[in-house]
From Swiss-Prot:
Protein name as catalogued: Carabin
Job description of the protein: Inhibits the Ras signaling pathway through its intrinsic Ras GTPase-activating protein (GAP) activity. Acts as a negative feedback inhibitor of the calcineurin signaling pathway that also mediates crosstalk between calcineurin and Ras.
Biased composition (Polar residues): 436-446
Annotated site residues (Arginine finger) in this chain: R137
Taxonomy, superkingdom: Eukaryota
Annotated source species: Homo sapiens
MF GO annotations: GTPase activator activity
Length: 446
């Protein structure tokens, strides 16, 4: 299924903004203005100048100072002020600090610290020839107009090759999924290869476990959850999709597996990632629901899509003006979907899955709900790892010396008064009695 889904991960022409492909290297050697890169590194992109929704420089500077303060005391911030972190992530992490903030949010810095030298060993080791061939065929497809990935021998494509190869060696039972390519490429645009690798590990194993394996069992489960949420939140859209036969697996894997990297303008992609690394997979559902509503929310839009092809085209051809980062993310965060609601729906759909479904059963319980849950789990693991186990000690006491038998006091033939006198010492003699000078009674009587 991974290969089948991977072949469809091609961005439609209508959404090819600054992350689109122009086709060949000959076009990159055209006139000077055409080769100019925008502020995100895309050649010929439309983001060279800040857009109308871009915050002013003073506001960006204030946000940068807030992030510097929060990241300087990260453990204290996450322990006591996570709500502030979430709010700042929703406003957007400043571009200059994403390289510092993304590894902290996803916990990649802890993984890298606990596994020193692991990435270097994986990067230097020879890869599986099967996976290396597949990865090599996909390298030129990942943002070919970005200045990092223009040349096959450039540091961008070579770094992407090393990161993806390292993951196949790190998790050989999962191997390589084509959707990991754009995810790793976006990470490499902001991070060194080692940090990008550990962020990719966290995304694949903590945020979205079961997404990039050979069976993609978690993608199937989340597709059913998404349809259930559509039925509850957008019933008219859900009915239309059912009538024209558009199932969630026809459009959702491209969105969720690539974290919308191929479906949205690049500035909006970064804002989605900021929120996703903070709040977890719930953000993906909110973004997906927003896209469906923008494409098919009105009766006129649904009436213009009488069949399957027209409906899929509408989902992939949302006007870029509606996907501008500030306005779009405001709609995303207004979607009423709490983590409790999402978990309740996941449990309900998990109970309805047939036992004959291919592959292993999904394990949604291993998915952590964002940066706060990851931080708490890593703190708990650190406490357990740092606590030294008590080594049992056998203490042998020396034998006690035998005590002499207790002797009974010799009281035979002795009065109690004598014992008290002996105990108290000799009696104290008082003053001598005066001698009476008179005659005794007997002498006077007789």
């Amino acid at each position: 299924m991974a290969q089948a889904l991977g072949e469809d991960l091609v961005q439609p022409p209508e959404l090819q903004d600054d992350s689109s492909s122009l086709g060949s290297d000959s076009e990159l050697s055209g006139p000077g203005p055409y080769r100019q890169a925008d502020r995100y590194g895309f050649i010929g992109g439309s983001s060279a100048e800040p857009g109308p929704g871009h915050p002013p420089a003073d506001l960006i500077r204030q946000r940068e100072m807030k992030w510097v303060e929060m990241t300087s005391h990260w453990e204290k911030t996450m322990s006591r002020r996570y709500k502030k972190v979430k709010m700042q992530c929703r406003k957007g992490i400043p571009s200059a600090l994403r390289a510092r903030c993304w590894p902290l949010l996803c916990g990649a810095h802890v993984c890298q610290k606990n596994s020193p030298g692991t990435y270097q060993e994986l990067a230097e080791a020879p890869g599986d020839p099967q996976w290396m061939e597949t990865i090599g065929r996909d390298l030129h497809r990942q943002f070919p107009l970005h200045e990092m990935f223009v040349s096959p021998q450039g540091h961008g494509q070579q770094g992407l090759l090393q990161v993806l190869k390292a993951y196949t060696l790190y998790r050989p039972e999962q191997g390589y999924c084509q959707a990991q390519g754009p995810v790793a490429a976006v990470l490499l645009m902001h991070l060194p290869p080692e940090e990008a690798f550990w962020c990719l590990v966290q995304i694949c194993e903590v945020y979205l476990p079961g997404y990039y394996g050979p069976h993609m069992e978690a993608v199937r489960l989340d597709a059913e959850v998404f349809m259930a949420l559509l039925r509850r939140l957008l019933p008219h859209v859900h009915k239309h999709l059912q009538q024209v036969g558009v199932g969630p697996l026809l459009y959702l894997p491209e969105w969720f597996l690539c974290l919308f990297a191929r479906s949205l303008p690049f500035p909006t992609v970064l804002r989605v990632w900021d929120a996703f690394l903070s709040e977890g997979a719930r953000v993906l559902f909110r973004v997906g629901l927003t896209l469906v509503r923008l494409a098919l929310g009105t009766a006129e839009q649904r009436g213009a899509c009488p069949g399957l092809l027209e409906t899929l085209g509408a989902l992939r051809a949302i006007p870029p003006a509606q996907l501008q980062e500030e306005a779009f993310m405001s709609q995303v965060h207004s979607v009423v979907l709490s983590e409790r609601d999402l978990q309740r729906e996941i449990k309900a759909q998990l109970a309805q899955l047939p036992d004959s479904a291919p592959g292993p059963p999904p394990r949604p319980q291993v998915r952590l709900a964002g940066a706060q849950a990851i931080f708490e789990a890593q703190q708990l693991a650190g406490v357990r790892r740092g606590a030294k186990p008590e080594v049992p000690r056998i203490v042998v006491q020396p034998p006690e010396e035998p005590r002499p038998p207790r002797r009974k006091p010799q009281t035979r033939g002795k009065t109690f008064h004598g014992l008290l006198t002996r105990a108290r010492g000799p009696p104290i003699e008082g003053p001598p009695r005066p001698q009476r000078g008179s005659t005794s009674f007997l002498d006077t009587r007789f």
